[in-house]
Amino acid sequence: MGSREEELRAIVRDLGISPYFLGTFDKRFPGFLHKDKLSCAIVNTAARETGGAHWLALAWFPNAKNFYFFDPFGFSDHKLKQIYQFEYEGLLRRSALAGDGCVNLVKSTETVQGPNSAACGLFCCMFLHAFVNWPDRPMTRNPTMDLLTGVPNADMMKPSSLAILRENQNQLYKFLSTHSQYFRTHRPQIERDTSFNKLLELKNQ
């Protein structure tokens, strides 16, 4: 099932991201329309009418002209397009940033989420917390994202990687429990909806 949009917006509010948050969007996200403003969004790889597929986080740091693209699976652009028919290059072209000269694309390249986990939206909230607090280094070398350990995407199904990714999800829940009143109030339901093996559970129903 994963995270509903209203859940993500409530957690974003608790994490202090709201002043910079454009909202939750489906794959038709129009891009960053104000090139001089620190801003971020959570974007689904599918159209809203399909019920959604996978959440990504996008962020814009104008001081360094950095466009951050956070995918909890760390998929390549080719794989995102292959699996979800989603490509960030088209999104960049739609954005006001496209005509602003050189834009630095900074992309997550490692997997932090288990292959059958439905917690992608929650990982995006965690990343955006890092972004609004450390916009020059939101991917690594900050107290939020350093709670997680990335593994190469090609190794995500290995038993040794699964143990690391399961611990990442535990750290994610612990982080949200510390920082989000909404998460604490609704924790049992959120953990059921986003569990580490949620996709397997759905397949076996």
From Swiss-Prot:
Q: Does the keyword Hydrolase apply?
A: yes
Induction pattern: Expressed in the late phase of the viral replicative cycle.
Site (Cleavage) residue list: 51-52
Q: What residues make up the catalytic site?
A: 54, 71, 120
* Location relative to the cell: Virion; Host nucleus
Q: Which reaction does it catalyse?
A: Cleaves proteins of the adenovirus and its host cell at two consensus sites: -Yaa-Xaa-Gly-Gly-|-Xaa- and -Yaa-Xaa-Gly-Xaa-|-Gly- (in which Yaa is Met, Ile or Leu, and Xaa is any amino acid)
| Miscellaneous comment in the UniProt entry for this protein | All late proteins expressed from the major late promoter are produced by alternative splicing and alternative polyadenylation of the same gene giving rise to non-overlapping ORFs. A leader sequence is present in the N-terminus of all these mRNAs and is recognized by the viral shutoff protein to provide expression although conventional translation via ribosome scanning from the cap has been shut off in the host cell.
General function of this protein = Cleaves viral precursor proteins (pTP, pIIIa, pVI, pVII, pVIII, and pX) inside newly assembled particles giving rise to mature virions. Protease complexed to its cofactor slides along the viral DNA to specifically locate and cleave the viral precursors. Mature virions have a weakened organization compared to the unmature virions, thereby facilitating subsequent uncoating. Without maturation, the particle lacks infectivity and is unable to uncoat. Late in adenovirus infection, in the cytoplasm, may participate in the cytoskeleton destruction. Cleaves host cell cytoskeletal keratins K7 and K18.
The entry's protein name is Protease
